[in-house]
C-alpha cells in the first residue's frame, strides 16, 4: 500500500474508534459540558446566555464593522457558509463536526473566489479577467467571525468543547487543527465584544483575538 492508502486506513480506524467510544458516553459528555444538570449548571447557563447575547450583537453588525475589506466583502453575506455552519448540529461525532468546520472554511474561500473572481470584460471569449484579492489569515478571521455570529448553532460553546477537547488528538492535524484554532479565536472575539471596539485584533498583525474563558 502507498503512504496515502496507509493514511486513509489509519484515519478510518480512528473514526471507528471515536464512534465506539464517544456515542456510549455522549449523554455524560454533554452533561459535563453544561448541557445537562449539575451543581454548576446555573453558572454555565448564565455564561452561555451572556455569550449568545454578545453573539447577537455581533451578528447585527455589517461586514465593514468587523473590518472586512471591501475587496473581501460578500454581496451574499456568506449565506452558503452560514448554512453549512447550521448543518453542524445534524452530526454527533466531534470529527464530523470538525469536518463541517473545514467545509465552512472552504466555502468562505470558494464564495470569495466566485464573487470577486474571474470577471469578464466585454463579450469576447478572450476578454481580460480580474483575479480575486488573495485572502490571508488576517483577512479570513473577520469573515469567519461574521459567519459564526450569524449561524444558528444550538450551542456554540458546547460545539467548541466537542471539537477542541473531545476529538481524538491524532485527528486534530492539518486543516482540522488550524480551523479549530480559528473557532477558538472567533469565540474569543465575541466573548470580549463590548459593542464599541471596531477591531478584530489586528494590532499585532497576526489576526489574533482575545482568548475565550468559555
PLM region spans:
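Acidic, serine/threonine-rich, charge-biased low-complexity segments
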Residues: 1-10, 121-127, 206-214
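Intrinsically disordered, low-complexity regions enriched in proline, serine, glycine
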Residues: 33-34, 114-118, 156-158, 172-176, ...
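Short, hydrophobic/amphipathic alpha-helical patches that form generic packing surfaces
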Residues: 20-27, 141-151, 158-165, 185
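C-terminal regulatory/linker segments that are acidic, Ser/Thr- and Pro-rich
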Residues: 180-214
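Short alpha-helical "patches" and their helix-cap loops
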Residues: 37-45, 156-169
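Extended serine/threonine-enriched, polar tracts that run as long, contiguous segments within proteins
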Residues: 88-156
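Eukaryote-specific, cytoplasm-facing alpha-helical/coiled-coil scaffolding segments in long proteins
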Residues: 44-62, 125-128, 139-147, 166-177, ...
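Catalytic and GAP-homology cores of small GTPase regulators
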Residues: 1-109, 115, 119, 178
Amino acid at each position: 500500500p502507498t503512504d496515502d492508502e496507509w493514511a486513509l486506513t489509519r484515519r478510518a480506524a480512528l473514526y471507528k474508534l471515536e464512534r465506539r467510544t464517544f456515542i456510549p458516553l455522549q449523554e455524560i459528555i454533554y452533561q459535563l459540558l453544561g448541557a445537562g444538570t449539575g451543581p454548576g449548571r446555573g453558572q454555565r447557563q448564565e455564561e452561555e446566555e451572556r455569550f449568545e447575547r454578545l453573539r447577537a450583537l455581533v451578528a447585527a453588525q455589517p461586514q465593514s464593522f468587523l473590518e472586512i475589506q471591501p475587496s473581501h466583502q460578500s454581496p451574499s453575506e456568506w449565506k452558503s457558509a452560514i448554512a453549512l455552519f447550521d448543518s453542524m448540529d445534524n452530526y454527533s461525532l466531534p470529527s464530523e463536526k470538525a469536518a463541517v468546520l473545514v467545509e465552512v472554511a472552504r466555502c468562505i474561500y470558494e464564495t470569495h473566489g466566485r464573487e470577486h473572481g474571474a470577471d469578464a470584460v466585454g463579450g469576447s471569449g478572450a476578454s481580460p479577467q480580474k483575479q480575486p484579492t488573495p485572502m490571508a489569515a488576517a483577512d479570513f478571521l473577520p469573515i469567519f467571525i461574521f459567519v459564526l455570529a450569524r449561524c444558528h448553532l444550538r450551542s456554540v460553546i458546547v460545539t467548541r468543547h466537542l471539537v477542541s477537547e473531545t476529538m481524538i488528538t491524532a485527528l486534530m492535524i492539518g486543516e482540522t487543527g488550524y480551523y479549530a484554532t480559528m473557532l477558538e479565536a472567533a469565540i474569543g472575539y465575541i466573548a470580549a465584544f463590548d459593542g464599541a471596539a471596531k477591531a478584530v485584533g489586528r494590532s499585532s498583525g497576526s489576526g489574533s483575538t482575545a482568548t475565550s474563558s468559555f
